[in-house]
Amino acid sequence: MTASEQTALLGSPRKPAYTIFSNSQKLLIILTATLASVFSPLSANIYYPALKSIQKELNVSEEILNMTITSYMIFQGLSPTFIGSLSDTIGRRPVYIICFLIYIAANVGLTFQTTFIGLLLLRCLQSSGSSSTVNLAYGVTADVVTSAERGRYVGLASVGPIIGPTLGPVLGGIISQYYGWRFIFVVLTGMALIMLIFIIVFLPETCRNIVGNGSLEPLSVWNKPLSSFLCKKKENEDLDETLEAQQAIEAARKKGGKPKPWKSLTLLFTYPTGCVILFNGFTFATYYAVTTSLTWCFSSTYHFNEVEIGLSYIPIGVGSMIAAFTNGFLLDWNYRRAVKKVLGRPLARGEHFDHDTGVALGFHIERTRLQIVIPAVVLAMLAMVAYGWSVYLVLTPAVPLVLLFLFGWLGTAAYSGMNVLIVDLNLKSPATATAANNLIRCMLGALGAMVIMPIINAVGMGWTFIMISGVWIVLSPLIILVAWSKSSE
């Protein structure tokens, strides 16, 4: 962790607050970022129930139409690679505005297009606009919260990408059935307009390269919420920064420099971040393989109709949402326990702990986070294998549905825990690091979605998920090495 998160050690001078935002302000900021991050996965999944209708109207084959899904995921991985670095340089607000303007324009075009080529290109544009909102949410979270509270707040930020796949198929099916598939994009346009207006009016700039801990006035009008022009900013009487601290923040602002989109790619080859990103990407790919195969498996094995299949996504979605909330508190509890062990006292509320100082005392952020992640991975693996065999043996539907709930809970706990660690390891450029994570996540997820059904058709559900577990085990030394080697921050 960088020196921006300082610990109030005995006898040390008073340090500036990590952020001037109150707890309620931080919660509102992160909730806004979370809602914005819903659009990328929602746009991907709301589209699925309408595929048959679109295929009939555009008169294309299923294989050709599936190109719109593959291309969406490719741009979902590539776009944040460039946008993440841009947001670390020019700020979160301008990038949010750019992304939503692109997204709204794409949805308007999708509403009126009449050709497959138009659909394909506009889906790529739609993905480019919405996909960066996910890593922006993690970037905003890292801007305003410290490591001691990052677990629960990053858990909250991860709710958006979880809600989208859960609600998308249900909402898309209802809209497509009663209003036609084009109205899906009308609804998305309206939702995006409301979100954009809220961001323009209320969301403050949080990027630490622009506003430091929030106390600096942004230089650009695009970094200022409209509300700041309507009411005078309240002075923070508790803020007593020294001249040295203020100069450090100003220097951080000037160091923003030019965007470096290639930095996301270099992180993939950086230890330990690269190891965590690769293992995390496969964890997500496994999750995506399970959800992608769910429709076919339940329709062929249990003869579920479209409504029943849509409802079958609810258990894994609910499990994922529970993990997003509960795992954050567990991560924070374990963090405070580890810090107390090396300091000999508990962290005071709002106290910031310097990880660089902690290393000399025997504290390792990688090990602290992965102590929660590794057990979750093992249990998720067992739940996934049990789910595969329960469907293969045609047990009562309640059994695989319960196992889907457990897999959603445990898999998301592992995934979100590694997301927190990736942010911890890259506090100077959290959005860039999350973009690298997103790139691998989407590419491996697309690969998992592409190969899962051919493998199931070849060897069956049970053996398919045993094979996936085998790959998971082969990759496990990556994460074990990070957890029990010397800290490399």
UniProtKB/Swiss-Prot annotation:
UniProt cross-references to InterPro entries, sorted A to Z: MFS, MFS_dom, MFS_trans_sf
Annotated PROSITE patterns: MFS
Protein's cellular compartments: Membrane
Recorded topology in the membrane: Multi-pass membrane protein
Sugar-bearing residue positions: N59, N213
Predominant cellular place of this UniProt entry's protein: membrane
Keywords: Glycoprotein, Membrane, Transmembrane, Transmembrane helix, Transport
GO cellular component: plasma membrane
Role: MFS-type transporter; part of the gene cluster that mediates the biosynthesis of the antihypercholesterolemic agents phomoidrides which are dimeric anhydrides.
Family note: Belongs to the major facilitator superfamily. CAR1 family.
Protein name: MFS-type transporter phiL
Annotated source species: Talaromyces stipitatus (strain ATCC 10500 / CBS 375.48 / QM 6759 / NRRL 1006)
Gene behind the chain: tstL
